């Protein structure tokens, strides 16, 4: 995290820089520089050749701030998670997050950080979704709680005739529009300022995507989201839900299991739902589940495709 926060990968890039120059530019002495660079080399983030260090392709793609797929802010998320995780016992005993929440039950992160920190990850997941589930015949998709618009961007890139509308709060959509414009898709992706619990959702879409959102809420609130989305779609409309889902017996994998604890620390009522739980809620909202697939071995993310009755 320190290497990302200090801008090591932005500084050296794939072109490289002598270690001494990099240390000087970073403003750190030779001993801590050696420890930092050695660790980055050992973990596969930097390459060292004759006293010159450079970013590996993976580090350049995911840790440089100017990369479309940058996970830089995702890594820096740890700065804001540490205070909450340090009070884990309190959260477990009280069944409530130890840090302040906003009116919708979200952990209060600095706004400028929150709007960007998942974009690179969501873009990669959206591309996997586009490769896995065909949106043939879909004309307009509603991206519910779409954040930066990354999933809509990925889907529209993969489906040239598809249009999308990102539904989220206006304070989020300010940044969403920047990402859409940067992607050159302003003519195909629009935004809609709406609270999914209280406002009217678009009724001109024949598909909806709910990506990495339901886990922020309790079973009751997640079911309410699904019901409101169902009410806005026509009969036969497509629903795709993406979630980090543990096995049905909750015995693994490790990441989804730990993710539930993350929700306990950071949300009021949030939990990682199993595939069976997701399917049950989706069917109760008025859909027929058609299939579920795992998106990528590393991400342990489930995509469930359903059709409105």
Enumerate the language-model features and the residues they cover.
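Alpha-helical subdomain
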Residues: 1-42, 47-48, 135, 140, ...
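Conserved Class I S-adenosyl-L-methionine-dependent methyltransferase catalytic core
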Residues: 1-6, 10-11, 16, 25, ...
């Amino acid at each position: 995290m320190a290497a990302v926060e200090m801008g090591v990968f932005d500084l050296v890039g794939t072109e490289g820089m002598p270690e001494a120059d990099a240390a000087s530019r970073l403003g750190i002495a030779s001993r801590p520089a050696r420890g930092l660079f050695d660790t980055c080399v050992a973990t596969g983030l930097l390459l060292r050749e004759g006293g010159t260090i450079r970013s590996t392709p993976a580090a350049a793609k995911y840790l440089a701030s100017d990369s479309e797929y940058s996970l830089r802010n995702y890594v820096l998320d740890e700065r804001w998670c540490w205070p909450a995780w340090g009070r884990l016992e309190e959260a477990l005993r009280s069944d409530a997050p130890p840090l302040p929440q906003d009116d919708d039950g979200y952990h209060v992160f600095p706004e400028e950080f929150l709007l960007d920190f998942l974009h690179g990850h969501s873009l990669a997941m959206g591309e996997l979704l586009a490769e896995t589930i065909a949106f043939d015949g879909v004309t307009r998709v509603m991206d519910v709680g779409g954040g930066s618009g990354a999933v809509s961007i990925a889907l529209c890139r993969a489906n040239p005739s598809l249009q999308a509308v990102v539904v989220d709060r206006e304070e989020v959509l300010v940044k969403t529009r920047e990402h859409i414009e940067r992607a050159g898709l302003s003519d195909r992706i629009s935004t809609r300022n709406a609270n999914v619990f209280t406002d009217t959702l678009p009724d001109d879409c024949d598909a909806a995507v709910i990506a990495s959102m339901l886990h922020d809420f309790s079973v009751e609130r997640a079911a309410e989201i699904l019901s409101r989305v169902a009410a806005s779609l026509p009969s036969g409309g497509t629903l795709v839900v993406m979630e980090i889902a543990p096995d049905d017996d909750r015995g693994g994998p490790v990441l989804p299991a730990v993710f539930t604890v993350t929700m306990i620390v950071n949300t009021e009522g949030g939990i990682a739902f199993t595939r069976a739980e997701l399917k049950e809620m989706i069917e109760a909202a008025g859909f027929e589940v058609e299939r579920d697939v795992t998106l990528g071995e590393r991400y342990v993310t489930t995509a469930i495709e359903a059709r409105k009755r």
